[in-house]
């Protein structure tokens, strides 16, 4: 079954300006079998649980993608190049 992604187009454009990462590229980390996902309690609410997934994009960039589950789709909220600490954690766990 293929994963379905959705996002706000205005946020997607703003994300490219701010973080130099497109949501199209960000969506490719979910195909990385070595990616890891953690719950983000600080940015979650009773109405929406948020998660951060760290993984390698199709371009080989290690990205951190904030997202939530919308039933049949993954809604991407933001994406950026992973921090040094996040990259180290990703590399050590694989």
Residue ranges: model-predicted function:
Residues 1-94:
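Ribonuclease/tRNase effector modules and their secretory precursors
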